Amino acid sequence: NNISRMVIRQAAGAISGMIAANVKEANESAGSIAISIFGNTTKCVDKCSEILKVDGYDVSTFHSVGIGGKMMESLILDGYFDAVLDITTTELADNLCDGICSSGPDRLTAASQMGIPQVVVPGCLDMVNYGHLDTVPDRFKDRLLYSWSPDVTLMRTNEVENEILGKELAEKLNKSSGPVKVLLPLRGISIVSSEGGEFYRPEIDQILFDSIKKNVNNSIEVIEVDANINDEAFAELAVATLMKMKSI
């Protein structure tokens, strides 16, 4: 992608003995798109990336594990991207509940500061990430916990946390100087919150959705989608929505 090509070119310049390699990236694509990804949203992001690449876009994915979110925000501020598909905002939940994937208070702020188009999804806000079961804070020991792997324990966010998270997401987007749309996948915001999944609690998801809707500015369209976040139809709509915003 554009970022890796620039790094390689700068490295080549240094190796050839240049004091300062000021490499300008050629306009080799239709544009550069940043996308946030997680294990529980991989299918969605893979489909989004596939569609965008076919259309000539340069796509960079960032794993929402803390450092990934920080890197994405930093590169957005540096002007590397033309738009953002923020599919996986789970780092907000980790920041709220002291999870291991927190990226700090500045997550979900850079695109708004830069004024670039962004489509935002509350992907994986149903969970907080911890390490081994023994690392879960004592105050959360009686919560709904799920071992995603031997070294990863997920905690289901509750009603109070979802009310807070919805408001936080909305208030951050309200500060945007550019176009914003929010997509709500009504059939689950992760794999494990799909029907029959370990975190399937549609009534809690609804609290999150309602909190977002009542706190966003009137200028931000909230689109409810009768699909799970990992359904192909949801990914197609997410990309189509972003492309329409870029053409405004």
Give the location of each predicted region.
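A solvent-exposed, charged loop/short amphipathic helix patch at secondary-structure junctions
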Residues: 136-153
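Metallocofactor- and cofactor-centric catalytic cores in central/energy metabolism, strongly enriched
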Residues: 1-113, 118-120, 130, 143, ...
